[in-house]
Regions:
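A surface-exposed partner-binding patch
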Residues: 1-106, 112
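Compact, glycine/acidic-enriched structural inserts
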Residues: 106-146
Length: 150
């Protein structure tokens, strides 16, 4: 049995334990092996696809968001760079997408109708995608993912 690493433990310190969890089938883990970072697949195996902070942040099944990601990227240059998969989302429709070729990620902000990406970075192969996944979770901020009353 694997244990949580310090990066995911730090994420949980900020967001709390999952408030909802779907166990990830081994077939899904196998389907994304070699496509998404091994560390993310290990988080799926340990934690499932889950909601944190009462649904403020979710780890998700990329297949559930593939059509939405495709619609958002249609007509942009991003599909020419890589094939992207949604790995997480917020309660308010911000999607975090991961590229399978270069192992770089960016944000699709549905509520503000923008894609936030460092284009030059997207063309560079990430030498340590597992470290990037750990950093993604460790650096996550519940405050930054919440929307204030307007």
């Amino acid at each position: 049995m694997s244990v949580r690493d310090e990066d995911f433990a730090y994420f949980l310190k900020k967001f709390g334990e999952a408030t909802y969890t779907d166990k990830v089938p081994e077939s899904s883990i196998q389907k994304f092996k070699g496509i998404l970072p091994d560390q993310l697949l290990e988080y799926w195996r340990l934690e499932g696809w889950s909601a944190y902070a009462n649904g403020l942040m979710w780890t998700v099944n990329p297949e559930d968001y593939s059509d939405l990601v495709q619609q958002w990227l249609e007509g942009t240059h991003y599909p020419k760079i890589d094939k992207y998969h949604c790995i997480a989302r917020t309660a308010f429709g911000v999607l975090y997408v991961w590229g399978e070729k270069y192992n770089q990620w960016f944000t699709i902000s549905c509520p503000t109708n923008v894609i936030v990406a460092f284009d030059k970075k997207l063309f560079n192969v990430n030498p340590d995608p597992d470290h990037s996944i750990k950093s993604f979770f460790a650096s996550a901020s519940a405050k930054a993912r919440d929307l204030k009353d307007l």
